[in-house]
Amino acid sequence: MFSLGADMAVKRYVNEILQPSPGDKMLDVGCGPANILPYLPPLDYTGIDLNEKHIAYARRLYGNRGRFIVGNAADDLQQEGRQFDLINVSALLHHIADDEAISLFAALERLLKPNGRIVTIDNVWLPKQRVLVRLVNYMDSGTNIRTPEGYLRLLNGTGLEVQTLLLNDLLRIPYDHIIMIARNASQS
């Protein structure tokens, strides 16, 4: 993976897009083994994933540097009443159906502090997309890769202000990403 430029891609994603601040309360949805954690400043990190093995590995690797939960962000964190400055949803949306993604965003919006942000990154279908990128998308295990409009529709009905970015230079191989930054503009 790192031969594809993933290390540089994660650094760039964290520094230029995610932009966490020291002390932020951050939720990492679909965190896997928490590979993003070494790239983050000191903050209050919670990673959640359905895969027990990923969470067990993250706990072994990072110990008390974060809180690692096996579960579903849409359900399990609601009951705790926690709120977050920053919610990262990385390479997850293209693996879930529209109705599940819409429910996820509704739940995440309730977990977001005023002026907090949800940041997503996924692969995307684009018109006139390079052949190699289309091939990589077809080979991806995610069956819900969307167009930019398709990703934006997932946030319809939320009260979030959404900005999108398209990147085609994050990895060393030709690959197109869509980034959505959804901000909770409420002040209370």
Language-model segments: which ranges?
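A conserved beta-strand element that flanks and buttresses the S-adenosyl-L-methionine
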Residues: 88
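Short glycine-dipeptide loop
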Residues: 112-118
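Class I (Rossmann-like) S-adenosyl-L-methionine-dependent methyltransferase catalytic domain
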Residues: 1-78, 96-103, 107, 119-188
